Structure formats: structure tokens, C-alpha cells
Amino acid sequence: VVMENFDSNEQMYIKVANGESYDILVPSDYMIQRLIQEGYLQKLDHSKLDCLDKLCEDVVGLPYDPENEYSIPYFWGSVGIVYDKTKVDLEDLEREGFDIFKDQKYKGQIYLYDSERDSFMMALKALGYSMNTENEGELQAAYEWLVECVQTMDPEIVTDEIIDNMAQGRKALGLIYSGDATYVMSENEDMGYY
């Protein structure tokens, strides 16, 4: 078995689009949809998958592959905030939510995940908009929110290194996937997930 890890869906997409061949890919929902639309995925042979009837109904038949012809769920989670309980006031998190990433109290103490999709989700949620909006005004406001955050908060923009860095308590808070946050919290009892 040869396994190759990618820092992002986009890195994986470039390899696939340039002709690299893989037996199994583990991308996110939006990338599955793109790979299907562009003809890069083969249909699954459901007769060889004895687990289909055991999958949670909440994660099958999703809009990007309604019949699960090309994909089955591997895991699911959310994007949230990992924080150092010794450095971040829980009341700040509860009051500010994602706006905590613009709280000057934490300037220079934040990680942002190097993902356009996740960053825009954070900004849209902070502004009270749907993370799936197509409204140009809302998207522009989210862009401006992100620009202000980067220009005023001195964030470190990272990918998977956030996991070990937060486990070691190097910053106060960061945008992270829930599964990664679970690992961080298992390594450092001072860490929480919001």
C-alpha cells in the first residue's frame, strides 16, 4: 500500500487533474462534487461494500453525491476554535464567537487555517451570514473581515502544524477541525474546543 498525504483538497486536485492515479481518495464534500463533475471519479461497486447498510443516515445521500455512487463517508466533523484555557477567557468565546479572531487581546496569539473555504466560513459566521451564501455583498463583507483580521491581528496561517503547535500551547487559539481538536485536547488538558 502506498499512501500519500496532502495539505489540502486543492493540492490533491492538482495531482489528480494532472493525471496522477489513485485507488482511493479522501477529500471533503465540495471536492468530491468537483471531482464527480469533472469526471475524475469512477462509480463504486456497491456489491463489494458490506458496510453501506451500517452507515449513519445523516451522512449518506448528501447533495454532492445523492445516491453515493462515487463516495461513501469516511468521517465527519466541524470547524471550530481550539483554545488554551489558561490564555483565553471562555466568556470571550461565548460572547464573541468567531469574532474572537479580531479581539486585540489575542493579537499575535492566533492560528488561521490556510483554507479559503474554512476562512470564509469563519468570517461569514462571525458576520451572521450563512456559510453557503452566494450573495456578493455578504461575500465581500466576509473578504473585508478576513483582510482586517490578517492586517490587524498578526495571525500565523498554517495547515496541519496547528495540531502539534496547539498541543504544545504555542498560541492562544486557532481555527481547527473537530477531529484535530480532539487530538490536541488528548495531548494537553489545558486545551478546549468551542
Q: What is the predicted role of each segment?
A:
Residues 19-21, 27, 67-69, 76-78:
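Extracytoplasmic
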